[in-house]
Amino acid sequence: HNGLTYEETLEQLKQHYDGYHFSINSEDIFNPYSIINALDDKEFNSYWFTSGTPTFLIELMQQKNLDMMDLNDIWARAKRFDVPTETITDPVPVLFQSGYLTIKGYDKQLGMYYLSFPNQEVRQGFSESLCQYYTPSEVGELDAIVYAYKKNVLINDDMGAFMPHLKA
């Protein structure tokens, strides 16, 4: 028992593990692996990232100078995703195909999809994984950056306030 009501538990499960969309009209899809683990542990943890973030994806993002802040607000045409996997140079289709980004909206007039993180688990886990590649390697410094991330981004929803910590 975690001290939450049934309704509060459902809301927390939704915030942490819901939100995947594979097409514009799809229903919200929960991450089943994370749901099973959260119910078993009776805690809201980041289970999806236990396998780690693929190195090739991080390298692709670094090559294209894709900023973490950009991942909260991506507009893309469908054509952007119609590229053979072996010749892909754009990290956005890879992020979508691997579940780091999901469809949040569609502008029919412009013919563009709005992509963002599907839920809190992915947003937090991916950002913390990226910190390892964009920050000093000292454990204490990394912990300070993770703290700044959680305080500024997760609690206050202010990515701009967090960014100076990465450049320090």
What are the roles of these predicted feature ranges?
Residues 1-37:
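Amphipathic alpha-helical segments of the small helical/lid subdomains adjacent to P-loop NTPase cores
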Residues 28-168:
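Extended alpha-helical interface modules used as scaffolds for assembling large macromolecular complexes
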